[in-house]
Structures are given as structure tokens and as C-alpha cells.
Amino acid sequence: MADENYTRITEFIFIGLRYHPNLQVFLFLLFLLFYLVTMTGNLGMIILIRVDSRLHTPMYFFLSHLSFVDICFSSVVAPKMLTDFFADKKAISFLGCVLQQWFFGFFVAIECLLLASMAYDRYVAICNPLLYSVAMSQRLCIQLVIGPYAVGFFNTMTHTTAAFRLPFCGSNIINHFFCDMSPILSLICADIRINKLLVFIVAGAVLIVSSTTIIVSYFHILIAILRIRSAEGRRKAFSTCSSHVTAVSILYGTLFFIYVRPSAISSLDLNKVVSVFYTAVIPMLNPLIYSLRNKEVKSAMGRTVAKAKVFLKN
């Protein structure tokens, strides 16, 4: 429990992004565009998968959940970030900060583990195609989605509760544009070595377990593809995985850089710059990656547009 001699923090103030005043409107419009594309792209992907029966497969079942998580993940940070561009005081209440950090950690963990579930799905599809429909049963698919939500809940409950139960010093200035764990820990008066270790272990465990699942899956996938004799067969096999590999590489590269490297707590300004990429850009890129590089999605979009035109004519 916090010592009574410590100042009770009722709100936090964000330093936010550092930029030239002349860029204020431009950056606001840019991040607003990112958010709108994120919302429309991911919502469109969910609707497309829902209405097109040919996309009712395990792969697109996982993709629809990934799109849902991207919408939620982006909405945890973007609305507050956008309003702060024109706010004289970039403030957030203590409870608001707790909730923002809680949901942020929740959805980040889910996204990582969903990508691992999708990698396993690709492994079964390419390495055991004859058993695919049996192996990837509806029950297993549901379990591979519920699992990430359960782990995400445990992940965020663990380090968020451990951090916010500690006493904060008089300063309430957060060197970030949202309530991320690293700058929050820098404001705590108590010994935070256990908290740092907890973040490193819990966040690291999620990243390492999910990334190991992905690496092992793609190792077997690569071996299976190299055994395919025809160049056309290898090309088709690679094309089914290329979108997922691209999304994984972008997300995991930034997350490992911020949360797993030992100097993550001290490099707050650098973390803030990199955080822009994975909070604003990655949720926007995922639907673009999976639509522009996926023939099935593009075909489904064409069929849906054609049906819509017929419906409007009638």
C-alpha cells in the first residue's frame, strides 16, 4: 500500500509527441487518417469474412478476430492521442490511465498469440493438407482464439496491478502519449526492480512463446515447401504464408525492441517514437497486407461489390 507521506496522484499529464508547432495540423490529420483507415479496413474485413461463405475457413476465422483486436487496440490509444493534439493540458485521470494500460496490455498480448494461432493453422494446411479439415476442427479453432484472450487477461492483470498498487512520487508527468508501462514505472517511488522483472518475464514470455510457435511452424512449412517439386506449387504455398509473415515481422520487430531489450525502461524517448509505429501504423497495415496480398480476399471483395451493385439496381 502507498505511504501516506507520498502525494496522492489523481491524474497524469502526457508530454506527448515532440514536433514543430507548424506540423500540428498536418500530424493530426495524418494520425486521424491512420485511425479512420484502421477502423474501416478492419471492420470491412470482418464484414467481408462474415458475408462471403467461401471465407468461412479457420484461416479467416482467425483473421476476423485479428481485425477485431486491431480495432480495439487502436481505439485504446488513438482517440485520446488525437484530442491531445489541440489540448492545452494533455491530462488523463488516474483511473483512466489504469484502464488504458490494462486494455493496451490485454489487446497486445491477444494479437501476438492470435498470430501464433494463425501460424499453426498455416502449418497444418501446408504440412498436413489431407487432415486439415479434421485437425482444424471448429472446437480447436475456438480454443485457439479463447486461449489468447485468457492469456492476455492474465498478462495485463499481473503487471498492471503490480505497478498501480505502488506509491507514486509528486511528479505526474508521463513521457509518452499514452499510459505505457515503461514511463509509468519511472514515476513510482518504491523499488521497481520486481516490476521491471515482471514486465520482462510476463511480456517476454508472451512474445517468446508466440514467436517460438511461429518460428517452429514456419520451419516445418519451409521444409514442406522445399519438398514440393513444381515451381508453381511452391509459389502457391509461399503466397498463402506471405501476408502472415509480413504482419508478424512488423509487429514482433517493434515489440521486441521496446519491451524485451534490457534498456527498454531507460530509453523512453526512443520507445515513444517506435510506439507510434505499432499503435497507429500496424493496425492500419494488417487489413491492407491481408487484402492486397491475398487472392481469396480480393476475389471475395469483387464478389461482394458485384452483389452490392445488383442489389442497388433492383
Swiss-Prot record:
Membrane topology label: Multi-pass membrane protein
> What's the main place this protein lives?
membrane
Return the CDD domains for the record: 7tmA_OR5G-like
Q: Which UniProt keywords apply?
A: Cell membrane, Disulfide bond, G-protein coupled receptor, Glycoprotein, Membrane, Olfaction, Receptor, Sensory transduction, Transducer, Transmembrane, Transmembrane helix
GO molecular function terms attached to this record? G protein-coupled receptor activity; olfactory receptor activity
Q: List the disulfide bonds.
A: C97-C189
Which residues are reported to be glycosylated?
Answer: N5
Transmembrane ranges, per UniProt, are 26-46, 55-75, 100-120, 134-154, 197-217, 238-258, 272-292
The question of whether Iron is a record keyword is answered with no
In this entry, the parts of the chain located on the Extracellular side of the membrane are: 1-25, 76-99, 155-196, 259-271
Coiled-coil region(s): none
Q: Name one Pfam family in it.
A: 7tm_4
Listed under GO cellular component are: membrane; plasma membrane
Q: Which InterPro entries match?
A: GPCR_Rhodpsn (IPR000276), GPCR_Rhodpsn_7TM (IPR017452), Olfact_rcpt (IPR000725)
Task: Tell me the compartments it is located in.
Answer: Cell membrane
Function as written in the Swiss-Prot or TrEMBL entry: Potential odorant receptor.
PANTHER family the UniProt entry points to? OLFACTORY RECEPTOR
**What protein name does the entry list?**
Olfactory receptor 5G9
Which source organism?
Mus musculus (Mouse)
Q: Mind giving the lineage of the organism this protein is from?
A: Eukaryota, Metazoa, Chordata, Craniata, Vertebrata
**Gene name of this polypeptide:** Or5g9
